[in-house]
Amino acid sequence: MLEFRNVSFTYKNSEEKVLNNVCFKINEGECVLLTGISGSGKSTIVHLMNGLIPALYEGELTGKIYYNNTSLESIKTYDIAKDIGYVSQDPRGHFFTTNTTSELVFAMENFGISLDEMKKRYNAVVELLELEEIVDKNILYISSGERQKIAIGCSLTLIPRVIILDEPSSNLDFRMTKKLTILIEKLKNKGYTIIIAEHRIHYIQKLIDKVLIVNKGMIKEITIDDLKNTTDFPLRTLDVFNLQLENISSKNNDLLLQIDNVSYGDILLQISISINKGDVIGLIGRNGAGKTTLLRMLTNIMNPTKGKILGNVKPFLVMQDMDYQFFTESVLSEIRFGNEGVENDKINNLLEELGLNKFKDKIPFELSGGQKQRLLISIAAISNVNLLMFDEPTSGLDYINMEKVSSVLKNLSKENALIIATHDIEFLYKTCNRIIYLDNKTIKKDFYLDNESKSEVHNIFINMEG
């Protein structure tokens, strides 16, 4: 169905090949995992599959890509769009309207599909994806998981034969990830060819027919069983409930911030927290629980409707919407922006530690999702602040870079407090020493992590699956 024959690609104004003589074949009806370290070439492969290269991204392409034995370059872009559905890591980039129903019919309207056929396809997709409760809603006010389903639904209305999902679990809680697994299984059983570019593998391991590992622009094809036993490619865990704590520490009584009976509309109610220097707080809860709202209040982006936030803190928030936090034309100038007095050695050491040194002259918007994430973390680390907050900091991160980020954040906690909103239990166990669980608009649990309280974390995540 999809075949790459000796494909190499170099982006315009770059001398380095992103892909080098790549060969593989994906058969009809297969569910394929595309994985590899951040920046290895996964996104380039995806963009070649769906026609964004060369339609949007210029460069030198050699070799051939075939779809159903026809050269992809001879197929018109709109035909590729109909046959090969694509859902990016951030589905908001797909949307052209603010209403879920309007969005689901938008692509069909553009392809001139008849009204009767549009209604038929719309109803079929709503039933398949169980979208009944989120149709005719404002896209801005539904959860990340619900946006993901709408984006998938938009692709399915065109009746594609191939569906590409780019990091589909990156911002989803355990409950929504479980629903995503069920959805992928449904699509597979209906005969769709599914390609999943992903670092987190635990939730789809039983559905995968083959694995394509991208490493330094080259491809290695293996089975899922081979992947479980490999030693030459560091993996995100396949068993999220069999992990060890790596940051057990006693409570520090050096108070940094007091949140006193704070509410925000009907999103958060009567929140009270004491935050101490040295705390690395894992802020957990389902999508829509209010985690992002709490972080924004602590950064003064939003003001509480009731209660007080007391303390002399300098906050810094790394948001999910990474592109909104870039202002300059290179990685190096981005780090220097607002940090002009920081020594060069300190900047270079941090770039080296987070694997960004070779990208220091690159435009931030051209980085991969994982590289953007690490750039913002490096800016936070070098800024003169004492309360650092991160909203899903591991989205798009492979195992190696997740470990690098964890190490940097633990070092930062020695003189500061950190709050990390995350669904990533592996990262949480590596990095955090305290858990705050938001549920039903308020704090349900607040405890320091040790081997005894670890079982409580398991119970919370299992509860979030239900």
Task: Put a short name on every predicted segment.
Residues 138-142, 146, 363-367, 371:
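Conserved ABC ATPase signature
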Residues 173, 398:
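ABC-family nucleotide-binding domains
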Residues 152, 377:
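Hydrophobic anchor residue at the start of the ABC signature
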Residues 58-70, 307-315:
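Conserved ABC transporter NBD signature motif
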Residues 116-134, 344-359:
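Conserved ABC ATPase "signature" region
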Residues 198-199, 422-423:
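H-loop/switch region of ABC-family ATPase nucleotide-binding domains
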Residues 163-166, 388-391:
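Catalytic Walker B motif of ABC-type/P-loop ATPase nucleotide-binding domains
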